Structure formats: structure tokens, C-alpha cells
Amino acid sequence: MVTLKFVFNQEKLKQARKTEEELLQPMREHAKKYDIAEPEHGFFVKDGEDAMCVIGMAVPDITDADPHYIDYMDEWTFDVDGEVEDCIEETKKWWKHERKRGVYYDEE
């Protein structure tokens, strides 16, 4: 089973005048397209041979569309059969690597 969990920082959302619903919308659209369930608020689940791919590809899609997305997160985890990856830290590592190539924005 593959899961993707979103936990937002309520204070940061409030300061930015954003809502969880607004920030979850891209994932919900992606989930609808790829038959990914959301059994709990902000918790997406899929099983099967394509589960890792279809859930995992949402992470770069979301952060490419909004590089500040992770600024609003307390937790964002990708779990493949119990092996958990911190999407916030992995995104920061990716940006650091890409910045060396002059591709992504600088962290504040």
C-alpha cells in the first residue's frame, strides 16, 4: 500500500490567507484522475502495481506549480509499504541540487 499524508501548519496558512482545502485541491484533482482514495482528510491511499508511481508523481507536480507549498506544511510523508520518505526534506534536497544548475528558486 502507498500513502501520501499532508499536515498543514495552521498558523502559516492563516498568515498567508490560504486554506487546507485550497492547498489539497491539486492533489484531489490528481487523485480523481488516478483513482486514489482519500479515506481521511489529507491522507491519500492507493494499492496495486501503479500505486507508487501515480501517488509519487503528485509531489513534483505540486511543488513545481507552487514552490512555496512546503512552507505551509508541518508534515508531508510518502509511505511505500512502511518505508517512509519525508517529502519536505526531499523537496528541499532536490531544489538545492537544481539551484546549482540555476533552475529553482532560492529558499528564504
Where are these regions (language model features)?
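Short, extreme N-terminal segment that most often corresponds to the first beta-strand
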Residues: 1-14
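Short, internal active-site loops enriched in acidic
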Residues: 11, 49-51, 83
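Short, conserved charged micro-motifs
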Residues: 13-17, 52-54
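Short, flexible N-terminal segments of the mature chain
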Residues: 18-38
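Short, low-complexity, polar/charged sequence segments that are solvent-exposed and flexible
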Residues: 22-27, 41, 63-64, 97-98
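Short, intrinsically disordered low-complexity segments
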Residues: 32-69
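Short, mixed-charge low-complexity intrinsically disordered segments
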Residues: 62-93, 97-99
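Short acidic DE-rich linear segments
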Residues: 103-108
